Amino acid sequence: FEAAPANTNFVTLDQNGTVATIANGAGLAMATVDAVAAGGLTPANFLDIGGGANEESVLKAFNEIMRYENVRAIVINIFAGITRCDEVAKAIIAAKKQIPALPPLCIRLAGTNVDEAEKLLDAERIPLLPDLEACTQKAKEYIQ
C-alpha cells in the first residue's frame, strides 16, 4: 500500500475485511470499528480522516479503501466540528461519480453544516442514516 493521505491515520486491520470504515477523530474511528465488529462484520481498516478534512482528503481516503478487494460496504461516521459535513458530502458525491466500483455507503453525519450536507446528498439520492447502529445494520444487509 502507498502512504495514507496526509492528515489521516490509516491502519489495515484485515486484508480480507468486508467493511471499510471512515471516521474523524481516533475515538470515533475506534468506536466505528468496534461497532462493525460487534455487528458480526469484519472491519478491513481503521481510518481517521482527522479534523479539518476537506473534499480532496476524503476522496483520497476513498481511493485508499478501494485497494481492498473484499470490501462490500463502507461505514462513514462523521461528527463534524472543524470538519464540515458539507465538505464530506461533496467528497462522497465526487467519489460515487469517479469510482464506478465504489461499494455501498452507510453514512452517518452530525455537526457543522449537516443540513447543507443532507440537501447535497438528497439531491444525489444518497441516504443518510440516523446513527452508527443503523449504519452497521445497513452494512450487514449489503453484505448478506
What does each model-identified segment do?
Residues F1-I76, L109-Q144:
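ATP-dependent carboxylate/acyl-activation modules
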